[in-house]
Amino acid sequence: MVENSSSNNSTRPIPAIPMDLPDYEALPTHAPLYHQLIAGAFAGIMEHSVMFPIDALKTRIQSANAKSLSAKNMLSQISHISTSEGTLALWKGVQSVILGAGPAHAVYFGTYEFCKKNLIDSSDTQTHHPFKTAISGACATTASDALMNPFDTIKQRIQLNTSASVWQTTKQIYQSEGLAAFYYSYPTTLVMNIPFAAFNFVIYESSTKFLNPSNEYNPLIHCLCGSISGSTCAAITTPLDCIKTVLQIRGSQTVSLEIMRKADTFSKAASAIYQVYGWKGFWRGWKPRIVANMPATAISWTAYECAKHFLMTY
């Protein structure tokens, strides 16, 4: 007589899901600090350098002298700039972000891991902590932006069609505007980047826990989740990015409008944008910003997770 296999299967105990799965969202507690710094620096350089031409186009769109550019002619604009100004025109200033992005992102991810380690129990890898994750992200961007802001200011000045080098631009800004010019946009940068970073980490970790509950190293999932967080955060923070751009380029010789040149505070920059462009002015460059941030954030997270995985394995 053949036994009913379904009845036998129903009595078999269901194997328990192991709760001590490796957590690739954080380095182990015994990992030295330099592992986090190296992984963060690698991620930052990859993120900012690969998508630099799109970021340069966004800066031109947001600048006071930019003509109205639409997303449908974004590729034609890139082609036109490359043809009329040279192949490397949209790469002007990349040295500045490489110099700044490495140390700044080392601080960024290092601070994030440090805060998360002290706020969240290391043995609790299964529970999601969005509020503590957001706090960690906010602390991370506050620390890293203090280091990155001068380099970002230099980058945007060079992006506005100038042939000056990083050193020449730095010297020119300091001599004509003083040290404060490198930090005019820092408060606005924090207003923009604190929610950006908080949402970035929360959306990324929420989506990875949903798509990768086993916490396994999976570059495809890291890339997908990074794209989701990057595009979402870029879209909602575009108005603040427009204000930041005005503050960073106000002293450039390419800015001819007096109202833009005198905008040295958040409120003045916002008022100048509204007076010149209206409400639509706060969304100038939103499409190239998303196009740049979606792959850039995906690259950043994928590179960071890859570097962590490599350092943990080897």
Curated annotation (Swiss-Prot):
Gene Ontology CC: one annotated term: mitochondrial membrane
GO biological-process terms attached to the record: iron import into the mitochondrion; mRNA processing
User: Where found in the cell?
Assistant: Mitochondrion inner membrane
Q: What is this protein called?
A: Mitochondrial RNA-splicing protein MRS3
| InterPro entries tied to this protein | Mitochondrial_sb/sol_carrier (IPR018108), Mt_carrier_dom_sf (IPR023395)
> Other comments?
Present with 1360 molecules/cell in log phase SD medium.
As one GO molecular function, the record gives: iron ion transmembrane transporter activity
Functional note: MRS3 suppresses a mitochondrial splice defect in the first intron of the COB gene. It may act as a carrier, exerting its suppressor activity via modulation of solute concentrations in the mitochondrion (possibly of cations).
Is Membrane one of the keywords UniProt gives this record?
yes
Query: Could you tell me the keywords of this UniProt record?
Result: Membrane, Mitochondrion, Mitochondrion inner membrane, mRNA processing, Repeat, Transmembrane, Transmembrane helix, Transport
Q: Where are the Solcar repeats?
A: 31-118, 128-210, 217-310
Q: So where does this one cross the membrane?
A: 33-52, 93-112, 130-149, 185-204, 219-238, 285-298
Q: How does it sit in the membrane?
A: Multi-pass membrane protein
Pfam families (alphabetical):
Mito_carr (PF00153)
UniProt similarity note: Belongs to the mitochondrial carrier (TC 2.A.29) family.
